[in-house]
């Protein structure tokens, strides 16, 4: 396993532990494969295009970096493995609950 997959930065931690709901095939992303809505605890909603690795949040748009919303979609759908150094008890219980993918834990 690559070293990058073993490390977890602050953005990864927030993506895994904060209350963020990933929705697919609902609202603005209905019938749009590869697109998701991520809703935060505050009610903010962001459109994610996983194929283009794009998010409409200010963090992604203005800082040109992979934001917690993009990472949350990747973890929730199983596109990215959750590193083994992450404590399962710290991960949001609802990770992957509202999308067809399944979160994957690295071994």
Question: Which residues make up each language-model segment?
Answer:
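Long, low-complexity, compositionally biased intrinsically disordered regions
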Residues: 1-107
């Amino acid at each position: 396993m690559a070293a990058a997959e073993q490390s977890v930065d602050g953005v990864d931690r927030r993506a895994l532990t904060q209350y963020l709901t990933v929705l697919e095939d609902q609202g603005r992303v209905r019938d749009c494969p590869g697109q998701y809505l991520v809703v935060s605890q505050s009610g903010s909603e962001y459109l994610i295009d996983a194929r283009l690795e794009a998010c409409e949040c200010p963090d992604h748009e203005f800082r040109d970096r992979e934001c917690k919303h993009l990472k949350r979609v990747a973890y929730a759908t199983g596109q990215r493995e959750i590193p083994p150094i992450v404590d399962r008890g710290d991960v949001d219980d609802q990770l992957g609950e509202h999308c067809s993918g399944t979160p994957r834990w690295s071994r």
